[in-house]
Amino acid sequence: MTINYQFGDVDAHGAMIRAQAGLLEAEHQAIIRDVLTASDFWGGAGSAACQGFITQLGRNFQVIYEQANAHGQKVQAAGNNMAQTDSAVGSSWA
């Protein structure tokens, strides 16, 4: 009996997570544009409150990006490790 694992699917999933992390930058910029459009709420685009909000938003997006990218890397590494182990075990049975 042969068991076929789709390790490429695991790698592709990890790559997708990392790609989605990269797409966060475009979303971040869109939110900043919206914040600047509504900057009167904070007292104007140059106000300390508006700039502080934008800074905090940037920090939050950076943390999310780093975590998503790291998770994608771990998923890809796990898939690669499983594939290597499977290959080693499979060749020892031949």
UniProtKB/Swiss-Prot annotation:
Location within or outside the cell: Secreted
TM helices/strands, residue ranges: none
Annotated keywords: Secreted, Virulence
Superkingdom of the organism of origin: Bacteria
Family matches, as InterPro entries: ESAT-6-like_Myco (IPR009416), ESAT-6-like_sf (IPR036689), T7SS_ESAT-6-like (IPR010310)
Effect of gene knockout: EsxKL deletion mutant shows reduced intracellular growth in primary human macrophages. Also shows growth defects in the absence of host cells.
Induction: Differentially expressed under different growth conditions. Highly expressed in sputum bacteria.
Cellular component, GO annotation: extracellular region; peptidoglycan-based cell wall; plasma membrane
Principal subcellular localisation of the protein: secreted
Pfam families cross-referenced by the UniProt entry: WXG100
Matches recorded under SUPFAM superfamilies: EsxAB dimer-like (SSF140453)
Misc: In BALB/c mice, immunization with EsxL-FIA induces a pro-inflammatory response with elevated levels of TNF and IL-6, along with low induction of IFN-gamma, IL-2 and IL-10, but no induction of IL-4.
Subunit structure: Strongly interacts with EsxK to form a heterodimeric complex under reducing conditions. The complex is regulated by the redox state of EsxL.
Function, as annotated: Induces apoptosis of host cells. Is immunogenic with highly specific seroreactivity towards TB patients' serum.
Sequence similarity: Belongs to the WXG100 family. ESAT-6 subfamily.
Annotated protein name in UniProt: ESAT-6-like protein EsxL
Gene giving rise to this polypeptide: esxL
